[in-house]
């Protein structure tokens, strides 16, 4: 990322802070890949692997952002560049619920796991159709926070993914209400219920409810001092998969919080990327 000046329609780059790095490393350019759904445009991107050869096939990773009221863009995303360097296609989309497209687009209250899930599956379908080099039998899914919630949800509703990495996730809005530092405001607002007003509705939106349907090997990554998506949420989903015989592991980071991937200790951020790629390599490569 650099500073630019836009004047009279002319863009001029002012800095070159990353020139040395770019000259010594391969940075894979994301390809803009929007899809249309019932007259609605969803902005997505595809990053081909660093060693892309159109005559070869590669595993692919669906990456899901947090929020949900955040948004991906055509920016340098370190985690995705690491995956591309390891030989993966990486694809990601701003589903309904994302920011930057107005309130109506971002409002998915009481629709978690429904309209967003449809968008992720439709996007994946179209990416696979456009890129026959992606092996449909070697697909992975990962995400953090809301992206972790959706990773938990997805593996309970489809068997198309051969591996998953659920990061700083939550899986149960009933318990999350009482243990998350934002649960008592976020959950009633987004799920339109509390444990006292409509516990059945909250349970319908809980990925852990669908644990008996999961077959996808799943790694859980959590920080011990994460109070947004507390450790108890990760443990619930992990324990549920273990109980139902699904291959799963959990990796915990001491002294880290919800910001591990962004502002955690460098050695921990490096380790997180290692355990993430190691799990995916074991199941997809």
PLM features: residue spans?
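Structural motif
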Residues: 1-4
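Short loop/turn segments that connect beta-strands within beta-propeller blades
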Residues: 7-9
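Cap/lid segment of the alpha/beta-hydrolase catalytic domain
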Residues: 15-137, 142-144, 178-179, 185
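Active-site-proximal cap/loop segments of hydrolase catalytic domains
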Residues: 95-285
């Amino acid at each position: 990322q650099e500073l630019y000046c836009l004047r009279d329609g002319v863009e001029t780059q002012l800095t070159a802070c990353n020139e040395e790095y770019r000259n010594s490393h391969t940075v894979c350019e994301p390809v803009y890949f929007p899809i249309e759904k019932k007259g609605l445009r969803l902005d997505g991107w595809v990053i081909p692997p660093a060693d892309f050869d159109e005559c070869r096939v590669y595993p692919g990773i669906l990456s899901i952002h947090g929020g949900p009221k955040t948004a991906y863009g055509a920016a340098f995303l370190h985690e995705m560049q690491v995956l591309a360097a390891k030989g993966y296609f990486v694809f990601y989309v701003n589903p309904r619920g994302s920011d930057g497209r107005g309130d109506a687009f971002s409002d998915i209250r009481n629709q978690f796991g429904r309209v967003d899930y449809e968008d992720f599956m439709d996007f994946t379908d179209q990416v696979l159709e456009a890129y026959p080099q992606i092996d449909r039998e070697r697909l992975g899914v990962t995400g953090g926070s809301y992206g972790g919630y959706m990773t938990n949800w997805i593996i309970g509703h489809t068997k198309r993914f051969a591996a998953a990495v659920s990061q700083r996730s939550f899986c149960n809005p009933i318990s999350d209400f009482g243990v998350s530092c934002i649960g008592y405001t976020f959950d009633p607002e987004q799920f339109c219920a509390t444990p006292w007003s409509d516990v059945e509705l909250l349970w319908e939106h809980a990925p852990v409810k669908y644990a008996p349907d999961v077959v996808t090997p799943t790694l859980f990554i959590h920080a011990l001092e994460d109070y947004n998506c507390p450790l108890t949420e990760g443990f619930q989903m992990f324990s549920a998969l273990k109980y139902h015989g699904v291959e799963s592991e959990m990796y915990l980071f001491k002294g880290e919080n919800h910001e591990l991937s962004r502002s955690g200790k460098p050695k921990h951020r490096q380790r997180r990327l290692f355990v993430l790629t190691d799990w995916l390599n074991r199941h997809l490569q």
